[in-house]
Every structure is written in C-alpha cells, then in structure tokens.
Amino acid sequence: MDLNQMTTKTQEAIMSAQSLAVSHHHQEVDTVHLLFTLLEEQDGLAVRIFQKMNVDIEALKQGAEGLIKKKPSVTGSGAEAGKLYITGALQQLLVRAGKEAEKLQDDYISVEHVLLAFTEEKGDINQLFTRFHITKDNLLQSLMTVRGNQRVTSQNPEATYEALEKYGRDLVAEVRAGKIDPVIGRDSEIRRVIRILSRKTKNNPVLIGEPGVGKTAIVEGLAQRIVKKDVPEGLKDRTIFALDMSALVAGAKFRGEFEERLQAVLNEIKKSEGRILLFIDELHTIVGAGKTEGAMDAGNMLKPMLARGELHCIGATTLDEYRKYIEKDPALERRFQQVLAEEPTVEDTISILRGLKERFEIYHGVNIHDRAIVAASVLSDRYISDRFLPDKAIDLVDEACATIRTEIDSMPTELDEVTRRIMQLEIEEAALGKEKDFGSQERLKTLQRELSDLKEVASGMRAKWEKEKEDIHKVRDLREHLERLRRELEEAEGNYDLNKAAELRHGKIPAIEKELKEAEEMGAHNKQENRLLREEVSEEEIADIVSRWTGIPVAKLVEGEREKLLRLEQILSERVIGQEEAVSLVSDAVLRARAGIKDPNRPIGSFIFLGPTGVGKTELAKTLAQSLFDSEEQMIRIDMSEYMEKHAVSRLIGAPPGYVGYEEGGQLTEAVRRKPYSVILLDEIEKAHPEVFNILLQMLDDGRITDSQGRTVDFKNTVIIMTSNIGSAHLLDGLEDDGSIKEESRELVMGQLRGHFRPEFLNRVDEIILFKPLTTNEIKGIVDKIVKELQGRLADRHITVELTDAAKEFVVEAGFDPMYGARPLKRYVQRQVETKLARELIASTITDNSHVVVDVENNELVVHVK
C-alpha cells in the first residue's frame, strides 16, 4: 500500500500499531494492533463514531487488548531485533479500505474506511464486533451523521468533521442541561438582538460595552428564550454555537490548516440554512486570527457570508477593543449592527443577584441573606471603582459564599484548639512516663485526668460538627435534586409530555419540597443551640471581602476600633502638642467618614495647614496615618517642591501619550489606586507651580482624577492634607497673651493665602487651619515626648531615662527658637543628651536595667546612673 494515499491520522495509527507490536515483543503487526491504536485515541474519529453507536469504548478496548495478549511473543536470542512483518490480514484490510474509499469517492484512505474494512474481517475481530452489535450498515449510518456529505480531499479531513462540536459550544443545549445561570433583566437588549437577527440582510448584532456588564449574559438570555420558545417564529428551533477561536487556531501548524478548519465551521453553518446562530465572544480576535504571509485572516473569510446573510453572527467585545480593531476595518464594521450594553444600576444589580441567589446557595450549600445581596450591590458600586456592575457584585457574593463554605469544610476553631491541646498533653504525657520521681508521677496523674476530660469534650464536639456538616450537606443535596426536577418539569412542558409533567408537578416536586422544608426547619431549630458551624452569608461577610479587596474599612466597627475612634482626638493630641483646633477638625472628619454620614462623592476631608516651621503640621499627618492604619507607611507623601516647573504636573497623573513614561502612570494616581484608603500629604504646597492646583480641583471637589491612561482614580476614601508656610511671619508676631492667634494676624494670613492661591482652589478645601507658634509650656510637653521616644529605643535593654525639671527648663531655654519651632529642640536633645548617653553606654558606665537621670550642674547637662 502507498502511504501517501492515506490520511495523516491513518498513517499515525499504522505507526502506533507497529510500536504496540514492538512493546509486546510480537514479530508481526496484525489487524488487532491497528484496531487497538484507533480506540486508544480519545478524540479520534473511531471513538466518535463508536460513541454515536452507543458502543462501550472501554469494553471494546479491553476485548481488543485480550486478543493482543493471545498473540505469541518472542524474546531472547531468537528474536530478530528491529524486524517487523505486516501480516497478510492487515495488508488485505488496507486493500479493502482503499476500495471503501473509492466507493465513497474519496481521494485518500481515512480512518472511517479502515473501520468499514474491519466489519468484513473474519475470525476473532468478527466475533468481537458481533458481541458489540457493530455491523457495516449501522457503522455507515453513524459515519454519515459525523461526516455529513463531505468528501475526503485532503490528508487531514478528520479536523473538518463535526467542526462545530469540536470548535464551539452549543449554548441552547447547555441551557437545557441547566449549565447556564438564569439571566435576569436585559430585556430591551435581548429584544434589540432579536430584531436585528430577524432582518433580511446585515442581521448580525454586535454587543459592545465595558467588561463585566453582561454582554455574554445577553446571548445566554437569548438561548434561554429559545429554549422556552419565547422568541418570534423565525428564531424558534434555532441553536446558538459559541465559537472558540483559540481551539480553531491551536495546533494549526501548516499553512491553510486554520482556513480549512474555519471553512468547515462556516460550511456547517451554511448547510444549516440559518438554523445555527454563530456567537463569537471577544469578536476582535477574528481580526488578524490566522493571518500569515499571503494568507487571509478570519475576519476577511467571514465578510462575504456576513454580507449575503448566509451567516447569522452575534459578536461581543468591549468598547476599547471595538474601537481598536473593528472600527479600523470599515468593511467588517458595516456588516454588524451595534447593540450597546450599558452598566446596570444598583437596583438592577440587586434584582440580578436575587435571581442568581438560589444557584449560589445550591452550589455552595449556604444561605444568603437578602441584606447581603443589597450590601454587595451598594458597596461594590461605592468602593470598587475600577470594575463594573453586575460582575463585581456577583464576585463579592461568590467569594463570601466560598468563605463560609471553606469554614464548613474546615475544622471549627473551638475543636481545633481542643485537638491541639490534646496533642500537646499527649507529648507531655509521653515525656513524663519516662520520669520516675514522685513529682513527675503526680503531674502525670493530673495530666491524664485532664487529657481524658479533653478527649471526651473533643469527641462530643467532633460528633456535633459531623452532625451539623451532615445536615448542611443534606439540605444542599435536596436543593440540587429539587432544581434538577424543576428543570425536568420545564423540559417536559416544553415537549408537551403531559404525563411526565403531571407526575413531576404533583408527585415528585411536592415530596422533595416537603422534605427540604422539614430539613430547613430542623436546621433552624438547631441554630438556636450553640452551633459550631455557620452557614449564613450576611452583610458582614460582604463588607469583609470589600475591605480585603480594597483596604477600605467597610465592615461594622468592632468594639476596640470604636473606642479607638472615639479617643482619636486624644491619641492625636498626645503626639501633636499645642494644636487643639487642628487635631479636633481632623478627628471630626474621620469620625464622620467611619460613621457613614460623610458625602460619598468627596474625600473624607481636605485641609490646608498653615503655620511656621516646626509646629506639628507634618507630624499631625503622620500621627493620623499611624492612628488609622497602625503604620506611617500608609501615608502618601508628595513633596511639592519637586513640582516647581510647569511640565512636572505630568508626574502626578502620568505622562501624556507619545512621551517617555506614558505606560508607567502618575506618582499620585498610581499610589492611590494601590492604597485607596490613605492619608495624602502634599507638603509645602506654596512651592509648587500654579498649574499643579488645576489638577487638584477635581480631586478636592468630586473625589476623583482621570489619569493619563483615561482611568478614573477614586480619592473618596482619602484624607488630603496640604501644608504651607505662607503667612508664618504674621503668626509669629500676632499672638495674644493666652497663646491664641490675634484676629488681625488671622486676617493678614488669609489675605496672603488668597493672594497666592486661586479662589476656585481655596473654595474646594474643607478647612484652612492655622497652627499657632508653640509656647514654653507646650515645648516642655514636646521635651517629654522626645524623652519618651528615646526611652522606647532603649526599652529592649530595660534602661529608663528621666529629665529633672531643671534639666527640662535648661533644654527649653537652650534649644527652643520660636522662629524654627520644635525641630531645633529635637536636634539639641540629640546633641546634648543622646550623645552623652551613647558615650556612657559604650564605656559600660550605663548597663542594662539601669535608671538614668539627666540633671543640670554648672550650667550644663550631666548624666547620673542609679
């Protein structure tokens, strides 16, 4: 036989048969080797044809394997290595296969011709085929359903058989099988798609919209309507095939192979005479798909059929990709009719989630509260700004359900703690068993008593946990069964099988519903007892997931955090001394935000801190970050002195297209995208170029900035603090005797501020806070704070440091300058106190666990160790 007259798959099967014979130490390749290799290929044509005939493939394969084992094997010195003979039976089989190819007017001998030749085989294979009722007639019948009226004109024809099943999914069949979730709403878009599909020409809708708004769901909704026959007469009995472009392209090694596959798909659709609607998700992938030098891409192959109306195609793609790929090819674009899929509102999303609720409950085996559904829609809309409804809300519910599900499957915390304690005591028991002294024996007895008690508790808890798990799984299984029966009822009613419908509606379904109700009531009764497992998804779980995703504290305040927030003003005052007004205004803004009564479309608070250097402006921002997030690292600090040139503005929001660094994003916008809940400190704003403030206007008013990539960055959960030294000279000179700022000084400072910044900028700031110069008493408090920080650094060596009143007076006198604030004081303590301590520590005069007193003698600071 000429191998060139065989298809690639037949050649591969013969080669595999040779390898099989060698592995079994056979001297010849026979028909049974070839049969076994054809059955070995899972996705092969032989397997597909036998599946159509309802043949048990595994049993047939075992039968063939049994025949192979009967063959004599030759090993040892008598075996001729590398020599294989083809039996006369196999040669005759291939000759018969050639005749079958001629009968079917095919150019090459394909796998189906070999199978037809097997049906005329005598001996063991004939008996095997008879056992499985495989005859030439029923084989030909199955072959026609797989192959249709195609001829074998190439060496790889198997790739073009059942092309749609191989390279696509039947959405209507999936709906019937209950694999697709229900589609709620979207009626106007589905109606528009139906109208376009009912046109004579250009009947190809393309769904365009943002990612996650439900474009694919609209097509699934159409498939559900087709199943329910809730479509016009022209669309009844249609089927929707979702084309998998990646499967089409994958493995197409040679030129023309991709085109051959796609042509096979298109021919099947053409032959269906409009019965098949082709759905291409990510439509932009057809532009350039399979394009190599001199070849056509998928888009150009589709155009003629689209224009003639031979191909009903539904596309779906995002706005950006439609603009980038489809609009650039006007000939392709004009063949599609646009259907814009808008993002649903929060109310619509709540309806969608209510429709999906039962599917999630069945899948995860949990109960979802309606409050959780409302929370998922509202919180995702407010806090997750870079994604779209309903996708982000569905993800929240799904993850919250998964969290509860993993808790159900994992060991409860209480039981885990008891089990670990038992393990710990068992280790101790083994160790004490080796000791012979009286004390160890007494401890062993006590330990064994405790161990037996704990084991009893653990076994009780384990039994309770298993029972609770069993109850939850029982409810889940009943729900799944009920859903299956409802699907069967729908199918029976659709097929007018009234007997089956009556049996389901009045017999099986009420019985399962009754059983489910009893199981749920039992579960509700058990819930009143102290349960180990929880199966409810509430708004707290949703809020936890939002907090985990975004870092924004959305969950209800726990007691510790509530106390911390109420004491926020006091906490800030401990670190920022002498600036009561500033501390009060900032803490009030944070309280309003956490109580949920702030304007949701503006930042938590925006402040301008004015005052001389070293009075606590930057320190307050750091303290706020530390108090809210337990870390000063959560503060986004931008030194505005770096933005003195006009072009430096682009560094905040990213370079415009065409400039170096366009892909990198802006320093401010990228930082906030990663930490949406943070304190933003714009230090020394008067140093920045006036153009910078134009960018800040939207941030202060609407809580958002659009960066150079066109992404909207959300500032609604940030505290914006801007510091400036404007008017500090007036503040230094204009103090009352009680330390407050004179009214005329305040007016002078505000006048200078208005002269430097535009009214539209100042008008958007919540509060302009004047920091007053520090008085001597406040400076003493700062000295205490500096010493406390020093003690913190020495805490691991258990060394305490104390300054006498005289030493404090001396430090204040020598180190404080009203013009420079508290910073010189810190430097003075560093130079005079810390240096002396360091010298004594290195000399080992001060040892661990010492108490150090700093005093004044002969007009200088001295260190005494006690």
From Swiss-Prot:
Residues annotated as domain Clp R: 3-149
Residue numbers binding ATP 1: G209, E210, P211, G212, V213, G214, K215, T216
Region of interest called Repeat 1, as start-end residue ranges on this chain: 6-71
Region of interest (NBD1), ranges: 162-343
GO MF annotations, alphabetized: ATP binding; ATP hydrolysis activity
Function in brief: Part of a stress-induced multi-chaperone system, it is involved in the recovery of the cell from heat-induced damage, in cooperation with DnaK, DnaJ and GrpE. Acts before DnaK, in the processing of protein aggregates. Protein binding stimulates the ATPase activity; ATP hydrolysis unfolds the denatured protein aggregates, which probably helps expose new hydrophobic binding sites on the surface of ClpB-bound aggregates, contributing to the solubilization and refolding of denatured protein aggregates by DnaK.
Protein name: Chaperone protein ClpB
Organism encoding this protein: Bacillus cereus (strain ATCC 10987 / NRS 248)
